[in-house]
């Protein structure tokens, strides 16, 4: 029994301590959960706001770049038109245009990236605007084969060798060569003592002492010292908390029988008056009394509940035509895309 009681007390104490610790943990985790919810809400809101802004910026940048490219292409075409007009004198001569194209083709191997794109734009311009053929025989030769038929390859014979190309860029520096053999010994130079006159021997007084040097590094650690004497015993600690109350002890042995009591017949003094007793039960009902007088008439009672709704009445006559409303607000062009204009406008 005693062991069971102790176990019950220990279990109760542990349960109480666990409940207290759980409540403390819950209270400590409440602010952490609140902060986490706030930060997650802010992060999601910022993402919902920034993603559409980024997409709008990318679309605007793409449209601007496309406009710049179209403007550059248009300006390049205009420049090529002006150059062709200057070289041909404003006349659409097929022979001159063919010579210009051949001259540009000869520089194909030496063209840079800029020349390549310029040639492409020039060819496209020639395709877009075909020239007239006033004299179709100019610059055109017919080549016949040995059998007398037309040439089927549609190519002319190879032309003469072109001019020499431009000089190439300088090559990379070569690796350094090996070390050569040592050269012959150099002739002896003049004696340095002969350049200066002899000096008289003299002794100067010693100078002042220099400043103290910086402290040297720390020395190695010394050997361990001897063990110290044992300390004095400490003072007596405070009294500990009271322990868990023990289980109730076993009942004691029954005591010996007591001595027989004495019976006294003397009458003692009269005691104090007792408290009043409880009230008795109710009596039987009495006879019926005479009838009372008639009461006065009552006042008007409250109003009753409203009745059901009646049938709908007939439609009224049509009203007069109302006055015309005010003019609406003028429309805006916020929903329209930006106009495609060249840069600088």
Swiss-Prot record:
Residues 161-345 are annotated as: Disordered. Pfam families: Col_cuticle_N, Collagen. It comes from the Eukaryota. The keyword S-adenosyl-L-methionine does not apply. Transmembrane segments: none annotated. One of its GO terms (biological process) is collagen and cuticulin-based cuticle development. Keywords: Collagen, Cuticle, Disulfide bond, Repeat. Residues 156-185, 207-263, 268-333 are annotated as: Triple-helical region. InterPro entries: Col_cuticle_N, Collagen. One of its GO terms (cellular component) is collagen trimer. The keyword Disulfide bond applies. GO terms for molecular function: structural constituent of cuticle. Residues 179-191, 198-223, 278-290 have a biased composition (Pro residues). Residues 292-304 have a biased composition (Gly residues). Signal peptide: none annotated. Belongs to the cuticular collagen family. Collagen polypeptide chains are complexed within the cuticle by disulfide bonds and other types of covalent cross-links. Nematode cuticles are composed largely of collagen-like proteins. The cuticle functions both as an exoskeleton and as a barrier to protect the worm from its environment. This is Cuticle collagen 14. It comes from Caenorhabditis elegans. The gene is col-14.
